[in-house]
């Protein structure tokens, strides 16, 4: 029988966020949600802010993943992320403030507003609020 696990590495500019065996990992890509099991076809995909789900033999973990890309091979998944946070690392008050700032920038609609940047900031804030709220 084929191995049911693969090595999962999640690396951000500031740390190795996760390095261990996983049975499955789910994440949000620019094309939608993707779930990866051992033996997946090789693939490289761009990631969007969203909830990262890791299934291991001893349970499940979730984290807020903010941009990056994933390289998938049959026996290893490597995620290079702008940032990644466990729920207990998120300051929900700061995330709420970031959400309000992004919404204000988008509503102002002035020429100086970088809409793509404001939308990205809003997505990140909503992801942080969502996952932190689940683990209160």
Protein language model regions, located:
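Short, charged, intrinsically disordered terminal tails
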Residues: 1-5
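Acidic/glycine-rich phosphate/pyrophosphate-binding loops and surrounding catalytic core
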Residues: 86-136
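Compact, glycine-rich, soluble single-domain proteins
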Residues: 7-101
